[in-house]
Amino acid sequence: MTYKDLRNFIKTLEYQGELKKIDFPVDPNLEITEIAHRTLKSQGPALLFTNPIGHSIPILCNLFGTISRIELGIGIKNILSLRDIGKLLAFLKEPQIPTGFRDFLSKIPNFRQILNMPIKHVSNAVCQENIWNNAQDIDITQMPIMKSWPGDISIAITWGITITQGFTNKRQNLGIYRHQVLSKNKIIIRWLAHRGGALDFQEWYTHSSEKKFPIAIALGADPATLIGAAIPIPNTLSEYAFSGLLRGSKTAVTKCISSNLYVPAYSEIILEGYINRDDIAVEGPFGDHTGYYNSTEKFPVCTITHITHRNNPIYHSTYTGRPPDEPSILGMAMNELFIPIIQKQFPEIIDFYLPPEGCSYRLAIVTIKKQFLGHAKKIIFGVWSCLNQFMYTKFILVCDDDINARDWKDVIWAISTRMDPARDIIIAENTPIDYLDFSSPISGLGSKMGIDATNKWPGETQRTWGKPIQMNNSIQSRINDIWDQLHIPCNEKPFKHKN
């Protein structure tokens, strides 16, 4: 099942016991963050605060706080199904002409899914049931915008989908960026230089003679569009198209009142506005996904000129902090999308994992089917340059395919027994680094480490390599057969050695 809007999804969550309505008065200033954080850590439900102190609009939090709710939101039974969409993205990134009739037939499912990529235009959209366009009526602080952490400089919009379009690019880009609230009609948009919105703005700034860069921000879109906007995909592909792939149907959009941008038609709230060419301000500090307050930095200021919303709108929000948080849960799920794209370039990769403790992308664990001397080092350099977001990955660890990349016990065993620090570590200096990473000596520039934790072949070592201990299969089977008769008090299932 897929959902045309957020409200349908909320009804399903409530029916399945995955959403809790909270009528008790709670303050958007810090209190909701603490409640949502405790709930998320215990894998609890989504939360709908119906009585936020000082506001009449309810707040929805913790929407994608579990893998099961992400699966439900895009209508899949298992998160591994996202690899099928990843395969389609890999196909779109490097399409191949069918080599024959059989090959053509095998590609038909791809072509069918592609039919869901174009947008569907909707007139009289519900997101424009109420329109505020007089300057004196524009007041975004009427929304119950949260202050997440004690050291945050102000309240901030966290789940707004920012829609932009470059000067020459026909596709419209969707991205999730933090919006610091400056006043009733002004916000700061914090986007990193490599993200689609920033690239669109830079292209417009360079080539356009206009003074105002149009912006739209959608709050409370349908789950597929929310997830689609949160995932970094190739810049040539619109997130509207990607959302259609996730949903299995075209994304419904409607034209903005003040510009030619299109917004999700069933959104709860829409903010329309513009960025003046040289209007910038210092953003932050805010608590971030790293678990620290980020440093201050200058970013563009957006002036809001129009607010539209549904009748009785819902404000969708979240907090970011040290994992686990909602972005890290989403990152774990969306990890599956990248695997087919990476495997298309490096078929020898068996698994690719971004642990949530690595703050989304700072540490990657890769397992490979090793085929030649120095193979791990090839993969390390390849991953750093494979996709844009991986240029910020500080640590890449490569293991053999007998290691479970998602089991720290396995990974640490490989590091401890298969790696020599002097021989098997690569240090790359003066490389691009996330400016939020205060551990780097210069903002935006730092070092990276690649670790080869694979078994070493002759030529990579002069010593006889160790042979892993392994029990005979016949003995394992025998003990499995008699295990229950032994009556050993043990919560774990009988351990089975890897073949």
From Swiss-Prot:
Cofactor binding: number and manner: Binds 1 prenylated FMN per subunit.
Gene3D superfamilies: Single helix bin (1.20.5.570), UbiD C-terminal domain-like (3.40.1670.10)
Keywords: Cell membrane, Decarboxylase, Flavoprotein, FMN, Lyase, Manganese, Membrane, Metal-binding, Ubiquinone biosynthesis
Pathway(s) per entry: Cofactor biosynthesis; ubiquinone biosynthesis
Binding-site list for Mn(2+): 173, 239
Cofactor(s) needed: prenylated FMN; Mn(2+)
Record-listed prenylated FMN binding positions: 176-178, 190-192, 195-196
Record field: catalytic activity: a 4-hydroxy-3-(all-trans-polyprenyl)benzoate + H(+) = a 2-(all-trans-polyprenyl)phenol + CO2
Entry-linked Pfam families: UbiD, UbiD_C, UbiD_N
Gene Ontology MF term list: 3-octaprenyl-4-hydroxybenzoate carboxy-lyase activity; metal ion binding
Entry EC no(s): 4.1.1.98
GO biological process, one term: ubiquinone biosynthetic process
Similarity comment: Belongs to the UbiD family.
NCBIfam families: PRK10922.1, UbiD family decarboxylase
Entry function: Catalyzes the decarboxylation of 3-octaprenyl-4-hydroxy benzoate to 2-octaprenylphenol, an intermediate step in ubiquinone biosynthesis.
The protein's assembly and partners: Homohexamer.
Name of the protein in its database record: 3-octaprenyl-4-hydroxybenzoate carboxy-lyase
Organism: Blochmanniella floridana
